[in-house]
Amino acid sequence: MNTSPKQSGYLKVGNGHEVYFWTAGNPQGKSALYVHGGPGSGTDAGCLKYFDLDTTYVILLDQRGCGQSKAVNPLLHNTTQDLVGDLEALRQHLKLERWTLFGGSWGSTLALVYAITHPQVVEQVFLRALFLGREQDWAEMLLGLGKLFYPYEHQTLLKAIPQACRTDFTKFTNYFYEVLQGNDSALKTQLANAWVKWENTLLSPISYVKDEKAEDANFTFKLALLECHYAKHHSFLKPNFILENVAVLKDKPVHLIHGRFDLVCPLSQALELKRALPTLNLYVTNNAGHSGSDPNNLTTIKHLLKTQL
């Protein structure tokens, strides 16, 4: 599989931000935008594993403040609405009339908000590990379900912060947010590592999924900072924005693959979306968690993209 970029460059989107984009696959094939997670994960060649590059033209973008994108200040002018605007600016820059979206975890949030905002240019939506992006969803990931399965690992996370901030989501995120923007380099590193290590603990019920990028101190810090930024601000969305507006997609094919044992984005969120969008094609994968690399998730995603895209 040739994963070399067909086209790459920077798109100036204003307010000191330049977002990096690249494409791969067949330019004459069906256009599919890969929307990465995090926020803050960025893109790399591994993101292409889901696609048939002989028949698909894959477009990838590093969201504001991460990957190879450039920013004067990564947190200023970095909201969900800004990211949606960047995706639309990229579509226009590439002169694509319509495209299909594929996003997992936070990428599913952003893909849905984009599709709700610009339904006229969206062919289909493929989602993995749905994340609705509400305050309660962030709180569940950081302080909720996972601690029942990994209590010792969760205690390690909590021990990194003052006791008064360990059970209240607002105090928890405020403390991380303040420290990660502060001047104590050692403490910033400690908290960023604790945040990302906890998230990685929850990725897969089958075995510990090693994210090699997480060993990169710069990547780890950016990921923790941007996730905390979006968690603190409840994804910059009104409560239940997706559920209350997703009906605009009722006439479009929307597919969701969700691991039954996802501890980052519990299956209950997928069921909420199904109730709000009865036409949703929901595929629950057994013996699978959050990671797109879990065998049952990966096999299902590749099959759907190959047969439905």
From Swiss-Prot:
| Keywords in alphabetical order | Aminopeptidase, Cytoplasm, Hydrolase, Protease
Q: What is its main location?
A: cytoplasm
- Give any Gene Ontology cellular component: cytoplasm
Q: Which domain of life is it from?
A: Bacteria
Give GO terms: molecular function aspect only: aminopeptidase activity
Catalysed reactions, as listed in the record: Release of N-terminal proline from a peptide
Which InterPro entries does this UniProt record tie to the protein? Answer: AB_hydrolase_1 (IPR000073), AB_hydrolase_fold (IPR029058), Peptidase_S33 (IPR002410), Pro_iminopeptidase (IPR005944)
Which top-level enzyme class is recorded in the Swiss-Prot or TrEMBL entry? hydrolase
- The entry's active site is 105 (nucleophile), 262, 290 (proton donor)
Pfam families cross-referenced by the UniProt entry? Abhydrolase_1
Q: Where in the cell is it found?
A: Cytoplasm
Instruction: State the Gene Ontology BP annotations.
Output: proteolysis
Known EC number(s)? Answer: 3.4.11.5
Q: Which residues form the AB hydrolase-1 domain?
A: 33-291
Physiological role? Specifically catalyzes the removal of N-terminal proline residues from peptides.
Family, similarity comment: Belongs to the peptidase S33 family.
Q: By what name is this protein known?
A: Putative proline iminopeptidase
Specify the species.
Mycoplasma pneumoniae (strain ATCC 29342 / M129 / Subtype 1) (Mycoplasmoides pneumoniae)
Kindly list the organism's lineage. Bacteria, Bacillati, Mycoplasmatota, Mycoplasmoidales, Mycoplasmoidaceae
